[in-house]
Every structure is written in structure tokens, then in C-alpha cells.
């Protein structure tokens, strides 16, 4: 399947139904008065995050989404039927921008999360609403309002906890294939990987963690050279970076610094992410040469270095043990931060509550 991570589309909510002009006509009621109903609401265009989608490819073929118009109001004060909403499935991790205002409308990250991107117009009022002492038989009603219309830009940022980065042909695809059931294209030439590959790696407990194999970065990637500029955004959501460094390719230290400089140039907090360096293809060098490379790396980075061979699976158990340890520590820190935030919010609510003088929260009493 072709990987598409950007798209521009048009969305339009349905027009509200027109109000009705009618009068009550019944036997023995010669002047029944106005009885025109309101028009129905126009349908809305709604985005819904779908965990089964991984690309915006569908938007290459369908670029305009319009919801159904509301129905006209009826007689006997009957309101017209509402127009049907159009629900559009998008991948989790889709960011929705309004092209006119260049503002972010929403970020759909959780399966089932919804975002209304074009609201339907309100239905027009029927003539029943215009009855007054001066006008006992109004012969006019309001038309329905037009629905919202927007030009949108969709941008997909993959949801992965671990991002695998490195120069082309460093062995990133071989690594994700060795760790997961993913089967990316693997060959002995640069830029074999042209799109991000996702793989679910299982912990010893059976829980799955998503790894993203990012296409090879080169010098100038942050400025748009090569493939890196297109895919650096997918690193933004990762929690941990796994830098695969080919110890047999030219100058490994210079190669490492190239990637670090590109991450720093791209910005957006990427260089602040925890990083593990995986020295790959160690079976091609002797231990002394690998030790020299590791010693030199420590001059430029405090990240831990692990020795692996993705092709033979050598050292992968130790690598994954460190990855799981770091991810578990991050999850514990996040849980503790969330707990403290909830306590703070509870304390503020208790102090602002005039009916509670002393409210115990998690064993602590806060006096208002």
C-alpha cells in the first residue's frame, strides 16, 4: 500500500432546510393561524480516528466531502428532517489544519476520537414564529443557513513509542524485521526504505509496543534534502529514539554527528528525547576497533551504546531489555505526574467549594 502522510481536501456542511409557510386549516377553525414548521439542521462532516488505517492514501481519490442538506419544514408545525452527517475515517495521529487561517483544528490520536470539521447550517424558522399582535397571518419564513465550508490540510504523524533513526543502509529495516513481524524491503543499497515502516514488538509480558523505522536521513534533511524532511515529523511523537549506527560505513563518528545535527536543525524538541545508540554490524569488526568507536562516541554523546548485529540477532536481547526498562520508567514518571496533577486539581476544587470546610484528599486535608 502506498504511504501518503499529507493531503488537502474540501469539506462542506449541509445547508439547513427552509422554514415553511402554512396555516392551520381545520373544520370549525376559520382562522387557525400560522403553522409552518422549522427547517431541519444540515448534516455535518465529522472526522473519526481509525486504528486500522495507516495512511492518507484514500484522500488522493476523494477530495471533496459534503454532508446532506436539511429538509424543508412541514405544515402543522412539523420540523423538517435533519441532514445526515458524513463520517470520514482517518488514521490515528492525523492533525487537521484550516488552510485559510493556518490554524490547528484538532489532533486525532485515540481510536474512535471525533472532530467536527464542517458544521451543518441551522434550519430556517417557519412562519409560526412570526405571529404577533400586529401580524396575525405572517406569510414569510426564514431560509436555512448555509453549512460551514473549509479547505483543510491533513498531516499524519505516526504514533510510535520508539523511533529507529540512522543513515541510509545502516540496518534499520533489518532491525525492525528481526524484532517484529514487519517485513520491510531490505537490500544492500541506500534508500531501500522510502516510507516509514511500523512494527509491533512484544514485551516478555505480551504487551505490544510500536516501533517506527524512519527512512534514512542524510546531511541537509532538515532543510529538505533527500527523504528526511518528509518524515522527520514522524519522530515528533516518539518517546525514545534508537539510533542505528553502522560501524563498517566510512567514519561512524562523523555519521553519528550528521544525524544529530539534522535532529538539532529540525528542532521541535527532538534532540531532548532519550536516545540509545545501537552499534550495528559488530560481527564485521574486531572488539578493539569497536571499543575505539565507542570511546570516541562518548566525546559527543552521553547516550548508552550497545553492540548488536541485526542480521544475526546478536545483542538484541540486551538492547530490548534496556528499551523496556526506559519505557517502563517513562510510563511510571507519567503516571506519577498525572497523579500529582489530579491531586492539585482536587485540592483547588475543594478550596473553591464554599460548602466544604475540610475535605480530605488522598489522606491530606485541605482547609478552605
UniProtKB/Swiss-Prot annotation:
Cofactor(s) the protein needs: Mg(2+)
Enzyme Commission number: 3.6.5.-
Amino-acid positions noted as binding GTP in the UniProt annotation, renumbered to this chain: 166-173, 191-195, 213-216, 280-283, 309-311
InterPro entries registered for this protein in UniProt: G_OBG, GTP-bd, GTP-bd_Obg/CgtA, GTP1-OBG_CS, GTP1_OBG_dom, GTP1_OBG_dom_sf, OBG_GTPase, P-loop_NTPase
Record-level GO cellular component terms: cytoplasm
Pfam families in UniProt: GTP1_OBG, MMR_HSR1
Sequence ranges assigned to domain Obg in this UniProt record: 1-159
Location in or out of the cell: Cytoplasm
Record key words, sorted: Cytoplasm, GTP-binding, Hydrolase, Magnesium, Metal-binding, Nucleotide-binding
Tagged with keyword Zinc-finger: no
Gene3D superfamilies: GTP1/OBG domain (2.70.210.12), P-loop containing nucleotide triphosphate hydrolases (3.40.50.300)
GO terms, molecular function: GTP binding; GTPase activity; magnesium ion binding
Annotated binding of Mg(2+), by residue: 173, 193
Biological process terms in GO annotation: ribosome biogenesis
Record carries keyword Phosphoprotein: no
Domain OBG-type G: 160-328
HAMAP family (alphabetical): GTPase_Obg
Subunit structure: Monomer.
Function: An essential GTPase which binds GTP, GDP and possibly (p)ppGpp with moderate affinity, with high nucleotide exchange rates and a fairly low GTP hydrolysis rate. Plays a role in control of the cell cycle, stress response, ribosome biogenesis and in those bacteria that undergo differentiation, in morphogenesis control.
Family: Belongs to the TRAFAC class OBG-HflX-like GTPase superfamily. OBG GTPase family.
Name this protein carries in UniProt: GTPase Obg
Source organism: Synechocystis sp. (strain ATCC 27184 / PCC 6803 / Kazusa)
Amino acid at each position: 500500500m502506498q504511504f501518503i502522510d499529507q493531503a488537502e481536501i474540501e469539506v462542506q456542511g449541509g445547508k439547513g432546510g427552509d422554514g415553511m409557510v402554512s396555516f392551520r386549516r381545520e373544520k370549525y377553525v376559520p382562522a387557525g393561524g400560522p403553522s409552518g414548521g422549522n427547517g431541519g439542521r444540515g448534516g455535518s462532516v465529522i472526522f473519526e480516528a481509525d486504528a486500522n488505517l495507516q495512511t492518507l492514501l484514500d484522500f488522493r481519490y476523494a477530495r471533496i466531502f459534503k454532508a446532506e442538506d436539511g429538509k424543508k419544514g412541514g405544515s402543522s408545525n412539523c420540523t423538517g428532517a435533519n441532514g445526515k452527517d458524513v463520517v470520514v475515517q482517518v488514521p490515528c495521529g492525523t492533525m487537521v489544519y484550516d488552510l485559510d487561517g493556518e490554524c490547528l483544528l484538532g489532533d486525532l490520536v485515540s481510536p474512535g476520537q471525533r472532530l467536527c470539521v464542517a458544521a451543518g447550517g441551522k434550519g430556517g424558522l417557519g412562519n409560526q414564529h412570526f405571529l404577533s399582535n400586529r401580524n396575525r397571518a405572517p406569510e414569510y419564513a426564514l431560509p436555512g443557513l448555509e453549512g460551514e465550508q473549509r479547505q483543510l490540510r491533513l498531516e499524519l504523524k505516526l504514533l510510535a513509542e520508539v523511533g529507529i533513526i540512522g543513515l541510509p543502509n545502516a540496518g534499520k529495516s533489518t532491525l525492525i524485521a528481526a524484532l517484529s513481524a514487519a517485513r520491510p524491503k531490505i537490500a544492500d543499497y541506500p534508500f531501500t526504505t522510502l516510507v516509514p515502516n511500523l512494527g509491533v514488538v512484544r514485551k516478555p509480558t505480551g504487551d505490544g509496543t510500536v516501533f517506527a523505522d524512519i527512512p534514512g536521513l542524510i546531511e541537509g534533511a532538515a532543510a529538505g534534502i533527500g527523504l528526511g524532511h518528509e518524515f522527520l515529523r514522524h519522530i515528533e511523537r516518539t518517546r525514545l529514539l534508537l539510533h542505528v549506527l553502522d560501524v563498517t560505513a566510512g567514519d561512524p563518528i562523523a555519521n553519528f554527528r550528521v544525524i544529530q545535527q539534522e535532529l538539532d536543525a529540525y528542532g521541535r524538541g527532538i534532540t531532548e528525547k532519550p536516545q540509545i545508540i545501537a552499534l550495528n554490524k559488530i560481527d564485521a569488526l574486531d572488539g578493539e576497533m569497536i571499543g575505539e568507536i565507542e570511546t570516541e562516541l562518548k566525546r559527543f554523546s552521553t547516550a548508552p551504546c550497545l553492540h548488536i548485529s541485526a542480521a544475526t540477532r546478536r545483542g538484541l536481547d540486551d538492547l530490548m531489555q534496556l528499551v523496556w526498562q526506559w519505557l517502563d520508567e517513562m510510563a511510571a514518571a507519567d503516571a506519577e505526574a498525572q497523579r500529582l496533577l489530579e491531586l492539585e486539581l482536587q485540592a483547588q476544587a475543594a478550596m473553591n467549594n464554599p460548602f466544604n470546610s475540610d475535605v480530605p484528599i488522598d489522606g491530606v486535608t485541605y482547609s478552605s
